[in-house]
Amino acid sequence: MKNNFLDKVKDRLIISCQALADEPLHSSFIMARMARAAYEAGASAIRANSVVDVQAIMDTVELPVIGLDKVDYSDAPIYITPTIKEMRGIAATGAAVVACDVTGRPRPHGEQLATIVETMRTEYPDTLLMADTASLDDVKEANRLGFDIIGTTMYGYTPATEGCNIADNDFEYLKQVLAMSKAPVIAEGKIDSPEKAVTALKLGCHSVVVGSSITRPQLIAKTYIDAVNEL
């Protein structure tokens, strides 16, 4: 039986609490406190990166977690939970959802996404799988492989979609994803205002993930500093 993550996040906000190694808030302790702040604000779930951060957050707040593991490999361009090793590692924490790159690009060591999905279904049957997609072709592939959740996470973050924004052309891309997806859609990626989040939900998204505009203060501060410096 699958877990009840989707029931818990329906029409609600998920907050991403992530800080990479080169960022000032990089610390599992700090991410856990950030998750606590998100919890107190009313977040329905947390999206988090790395086994240690996921575990620290789960030890701190009673919220479901979308877990991922960003790892760079020299033989492949993708980095969000790219191999079965990272998938297993995140699932073993007890995270409700494991998210991974589903952008059609090569995976490290020649691993095949279909094989990874099949293995996860066998070893972690109660764990939901979220496809971090960047294009309609990616959504089709996620449908074919039976992902439980389809995210727009990578739209605007791949070479083919660089510069794209989910709100472009009155959210036309998101509308197409919603029409095509066979699984609940979670809007993610450049949702940088409450208005965008509300629009995504009104269009039919199951829930919305917001990260940088809430939990990355160096980026938030820069928007103010850039505006002031233009005077």
UniProtKB/Swiss-Prot annotation:
Family in the record: Belongs to the NanE family.
Sections of the chain in a coiled coil: none
Species assigned in the record: Latilactobacillus sakei subsp. sakei (strain 23K) (Lactobacillus sakei subsp. sakei)
CDD domains the UniProt entry points to: NanE
Pathway(s) the chain acts in: Amino-sugar metabolism; N-acetylneuraminate degradation; D-fructose 6-phosphate from N-acetylneuraminate: step 3/5
One cellular component (GO) term of this entry: cytosol
Recorded superkingdom: Bacteria
UniProt keyword terms in alphabetical order: Carbohydrate metabolism, Isomerase
Annotated GO biological process: carbohydrate metabolic process; N-acetylmannosamine catabolic process; N-acetylneuraminate catabolic process
Enzyme Commission number: 5.1.3.9
Catalytic activity: an N-acyl-D-glucosamine 6-phosphate = an N-acyl-D-mannosamine 6-phosphate
InterPro entries recorded: Aldolase_TIM (IPR013785), NanE (IPR007260), RibuloseP-bd_barrel (IPR011060)
Protein name: Putative N-acetylmannosamine-6-phosphate 2-epimerase
Xref: Gene3D superfamilies: Aldolase class I (3.20.20.70)
Enzyme class: isomerase
A GO molecular-function descriptor: N-acylglucosamine-6-phosphate 2-epimerase activity
Summary of the function given for this chain in its UniProt record: Converts N-acetylmannosamine-6-phosphate (ManNAc-6-P) to N-acetylglucosamine-6-phosphate (GlcNAc-6-P).
